[in-house]
């Protein structure tokens, strides 16, 4: 954050509430895992306190630097239109996402945008579940945008399916972010590199159609060998930091 402040780089915050990155002890009485899970009231108080502390501290120490936040990450279950079972649903219940956004809106500085972020957006029935959740947050007046994680592979999901998902989210008049973009391939043969470039290009054509709504397209890494999917060569630069055909394709489309 110091570097961003000193170099005039605005920041998107990730993430306030995420089931998989919240310590188990946070959900238990006395913060001790051998004790029972907390009551709804206790967990709501802990959630509010945590969100308040993070947002207040960042705003006081880095005023105006963090311009948006992912409030909740990956709450909808794969292969379902329901929230995934987690310690948040076990303690707070099915409205934990709504409560997180309520608290984030309460403590965020004026003008800070609040996002829900998830993956596998193009896949039904998950897309339906995401839309239902977004509609409830829109009704609450607490959400500004949706973050599309886009951890794809060439041909999967199809471009048409990605386009359809964008249509469903965009018609809800939310801001959009492509929050985690990478595209896997089996190997770095010239044929596969060209397929990767074409798929990246087709994705970017979709993104450009919503350019008035998309705040950012964030590639999930820089060079292939440092990617979390290193064995799938998913990024725009190879292990030697040389641009791949996908990079050239995106540059051409951006001009």
Task: Please describe what each predicted stretch is.
Residues 1-115, 119-121, 174, 183-185:
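Substrate-binding cleft and catalytic face of glycoside hydrolase catalytic domains
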Residues 81-82, 123-139, 158-166:
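Distinct, well-ordered alpha-helical segments
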Residues 47-57, 124-137, 197-206:
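Short, acidic/polar
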Residues 120-123, 152-154:
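Short histidine/acidic/glycine/proline-rich micro-motifs that form metal-
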Residues 57-60, 64-65, 70-94, 99, ...:
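Aromatic-rich peripheral "rim/lid" segments of glycoside hydrolase catalytic domains that contact
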Residues 5, 59, 138-139, 208:
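Non-catalytic positions within long, well-ordered alpha-helices that form the structural scaffold/packing
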Residues 10-16, 143, 150-151, 155, ...:
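His-enriched metal-coordination microenvironments in redox/metal-binding proteins
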Residues 115-117, 145-149, 177-180:
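Short, conserved beta-strand edge motifs with alternating hydrophobic and charged residues
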């Amino acid at each position: 954050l110091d570097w961003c402040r000193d170099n005039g780089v605005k920041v998107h915050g990730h993430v306030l509430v995420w089931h998989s990155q919240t310590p188990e002890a946070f959900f238990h009485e006395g913060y001790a895992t051998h004790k029972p899970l907390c009551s709804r009231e206790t967990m709501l108080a802990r959630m509010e306190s945590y969100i308040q502390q993070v947002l207040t501290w960042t705003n006081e120490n880095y005023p105006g630097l963090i311009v948006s936040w992912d409030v909740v990450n990956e709450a909808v279950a794969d292969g379902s239109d329901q929230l995934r079972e987690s310690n948040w649903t076990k303690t707070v219940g099915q409205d934990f996402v709504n409560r997180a956004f309520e608290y984030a809106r309460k403590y965020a500085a004026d003008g800070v945008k609040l996002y829900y972020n998830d993956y596998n957006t193009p896949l039904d029935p998950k897309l339906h579940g995401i839309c239902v959740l977004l509609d409830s947050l829109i009704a609450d007046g607490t959400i500004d945008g949706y973050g599309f994680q886009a951890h794809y592979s060439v041909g999967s999901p199809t471009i048409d399916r990605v386009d359809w998902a964008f249509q469903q989210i965009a018609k809800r008049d939310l801001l959009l972010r492509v929050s985690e973009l990478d595209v896997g391939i089996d190997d770095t043969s010239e044929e596969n590199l060209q397929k990767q470039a074409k798929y990246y290009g087709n994705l970017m054509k979709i993104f450009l159609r919503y350019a008035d709504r998309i705040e950012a397209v964030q590639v999930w890494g820089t060079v292939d060998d440092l990617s979390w999917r290193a064995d799938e060569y998913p990024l725009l630069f190879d292990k030697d930091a040389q641009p791949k055909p996908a990079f050239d394709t995106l540059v051409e489309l951006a001009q």
